[in-house]
Amino acid sequence: MSQTAIIIWIVVIIILLVLGGLGAYFFYSRYRHRKNIPPTPINPPSSITPIQPINPPSSITPIQPSGPPSGGNHPIPASCPAYQLVNNKAITLVPLPADTSNVKNAQDCQNLCTQNPDCYFYNYVGLFDGCSLMQGTVDNNVMTGFAIRGSEDGCPKWARYNTSIQGFNTGNPSNVESEEKCQQLCQQNSSCDWYTYDIGKKTCTLNKAIDFNTSTLGIKMPH
């Protein structure tokens, strides 16, 4: 090989080495640049709106009852009698404790019932001046209504108490959905002196007082 050819090859090799070095430097510089640039973080939203719970109303309005049946316990006008009197009728129950030794007539017996807040009705037997103050079995799930016969306009048609009173059963109608319906059934039955309606069991019982000569049944009108 001539000297000229050798020189040319040497120059070519030098040029290739220079180009290779420049290329290597170029790629190395890009690599360092990329490595030194921190990655761009994915920022969360400035504020996350939390899901608001659905709050219940501050107060729940209870279902209001429709009120007592017609002729219920309303304020009684002063012109209305304080008692419903039924002659020759009696209810046989265990009487309330009371001193009846001074009772001489039906009015005395009535006065004792008036003075006793637990007395709902009384029996006075004129044959031997017997006076019994009665209440029945108090039960908030039971409503007893006494029919007030011949009451004047504006005066109660029924005397209603949360008590159970046994009498002569004149009917046990089934599927009675309300006290008002039980009251209507008693009103339609001429033998019914009072009804007893069990609110929980939805049972209606129509009752009749016993016939008893010289006896007066006095039913206190609730205020």
From Swiss-Prot:
Domain called PAN: residue spans: 80-155, 159-223
Gene3D superfamilies found in the cross-reference section: Hepatocyte Growth Factor
Record field: compositional bias (Low complexity): 45-64
Subcellular location: Secreted; Virion
GO CC list: extracellular region; virion component
Annotated signal peptide: 1-23
Region described as Disordered: 39-73
InterPro entries on file: Pan_app
Keywords, comma-separated and alphabetical: Disulfide bond, Glycoprotein, Repeat, Secreted, Signal, Virion
Disulfide bonds, paired cysteine numbers: C80-C155, C109-C131, C182-C204
Protein's name in the database: Putative PAN domain-containing protein R486
